[in-house]
């Protein structure tokens, strides 16, 4: 949503609107802006976060999260998602796009397949103690993100007055369309 190093906010809705009719889900890495940016509300189908950064807030545990918004029609173009739309022999020939809604009542075949197949194949589930540590940070992520943004704005204001500083990169310091996207997508900080 807000990639390094130039902090040019990604055009979430615009890209999602191009892909959806073609059966292409928009997957966003929102590690840099949890709470501030809500990609699912703007048309993203899947959102990822590194839990180690802002969400955990302390760097004691390595982890990640994938959120399936349940808002994407995985049947729109079945050929684009063969892993979801063709029989999975490792699960008795289950077709994820058909089985998941029947079992869960939700349109989340991507994240269910990710959870059961990828975790089975890689053995990468989060340990209970690490989950507990991340939850400790999650409790205050909203407050911390607000303070991070407030502090960043103060640093930007200070740096802009320094003669030895040639350029300050900050999402709302850009001009035109890039600034408009920052104001549109980055709220809550």
Residue ranges and their predicted role:
Residues 166-189:
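Conserved PLP-binding catalytic core of the aspartate aminotransferase-like
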